[in-house]
């Protein structure tokens, strides 16, 4: 994606033994109508056989600790409908109505206040 190699973008991976089982990409980007330093979670995926085991939760919590360290104020994402419950369980809140991302399906913007 555009911006993936920017100085203020970062990418995380969760390994089990030597197998990459979960990834997440973050990009410093302010959300419209939000103040402060924002980061967008631009993509996250976990191998199907490892879903529901807390791997994504651990990876995202690691990212949140890092974002506190770089003085980010909030993290936001365009969450797929099937992932709403996951993000809500981490403290994210809805900040938009449902919308369709062409070729992917229903989404809602969500955010988490970091500091």
Name what the model sees in each region.
Residues 50, 54-62:
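Conserved acetyl-CoA pyrophosphate-binding loop and the N-cap/start of the following alpha-helix
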Residues 29-41, 51, 104-107:
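A conserved beta-turn-beta hairpin within the catalytic core of GNAT-like acetyltransferases
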Residues 2-7:
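Short loop/turn motifs at secondary-structure junctions and domain boundaries
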Residues 76-78, 93-109:
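Conserved catalytic-core motifs of GNAT/GCN5-like acyltransferases
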Residues 87, 92:
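Conserved active-site tyrosine of GNAT-family acetyltransferases
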Residues 67-80:
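Conserved GNAT acetyl-CoA-binding A-motif
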Residues 59, 83-86:
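Conserved short alpha-helix immediately C-terminal to the canonical SAM/SAH-binding motif I
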Residues 13, 19-29, 40-45:
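Conserved beta-strand in the GNAT
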């Amino acid at each position: 994606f555009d911006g993936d190699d920017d100085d203020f973008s970062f990418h995380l991976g969760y390994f089990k033994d030597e197998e990459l089982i979960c990834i997440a990409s973050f990009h410093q980007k302010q959300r419209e109508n939000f103040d402060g330093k924002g980061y967008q979670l631009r993509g996250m995926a976990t191998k199907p056989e490892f879903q529901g085991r807390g791997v994504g939760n651990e990876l995202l919590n690691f990212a949140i600790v890092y974002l506190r360290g770089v003085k980010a104020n909030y993290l936001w994402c365009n969450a797929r409908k099937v992932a709403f419950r996951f993000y809500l369980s981490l403290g994210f809140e809805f900040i938009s109505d449902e919308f369709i991302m062409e070729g992917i399906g229903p989404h809602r913007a969500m955010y988490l206040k970091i500091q």
